């Protein structure tokens, strides 16, 4: 009798050990806005731990509080950088910047007080979405939807342009963060 009870008990234990537990999604606990305001200097955008790239918006820098490229108090975008430092308190990287545009643009950063200066655009917090590895917003000046994503080695950008014959993407190799600038860069055309 003991043997008969013992076998079903072992069978039940083995069946329980074989079932796989559903892994918990810890990304639901991430608040990507922590540290993005005041003196936090934390980067906002699409990145993953120890990733090669950090894609995200770059605002018009006003003080050293913008040294990560983003400050929650600001709703301007001058481009989407592919390398950012986070939490350092000093500007660096952000050297490769893409800015989707529609129509005639004035190259350069411009100033937040003058909408006709530079190629910058405003965005709305209502349109902004950020999660681990993902960032999205809408450029109000151009009507362009922006989505950025990152993996450990690669970043991807997707731009949804309105119907236009005059849409483009500006590649800014002179971009830098705050007082930091690229000093020696260029483009070499390898083929047609």
Question: Which role does the model predict for each range below?
Answer:
Residues 1-7:
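Bacterial N-terminal signal peptides that target proteins for export
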Residues 8-16:
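Bacterial N-terminal signal peptides
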Residues 20-192:
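Accessory carbohydrate-recognition regions in carbohydrate-active enzymes
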């Amino acid at each position: 009798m003991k043997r008969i009870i013992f076998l079903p008990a072992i069978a039940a234990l083995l069946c329980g050990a074989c079932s796989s537990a559903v892994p918990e999604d810890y990304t639901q606990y991430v608040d990507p806005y922590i540290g993005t305001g005041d003196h936090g200097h934390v980067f906002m955008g699409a990145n993953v731990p120890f990733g090669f790239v950090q894609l995200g918006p770059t605002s018009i820098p006003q003080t050293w509080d913008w040294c990560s490229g983003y400050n929650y108090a600001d709703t301007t975008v001058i481009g989407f950088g592919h390398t950012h430092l986070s939490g350092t308190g000093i500007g660096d990287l952000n050297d490769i910047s893409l800015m989707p545009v529609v129509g005639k643009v004035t190259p350069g950063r411009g100033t937040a007080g003058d909408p006709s200066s530079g190629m910058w655009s405003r965005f709305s917090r209502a349109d902004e979405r950020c999660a681990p590895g993902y960032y999205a917003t809408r450029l109000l000046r151009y009507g362009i939807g922006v989505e950025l994503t990152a993996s450990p080695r690669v970043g991807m950008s997707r731009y949804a342009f309105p119907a236009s014959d005059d849409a483009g993407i500006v590649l800014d190799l002179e971009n830098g963060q705050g007082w930091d600038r690229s000093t020696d860069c260029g483009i070499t055309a390898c083929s047609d």
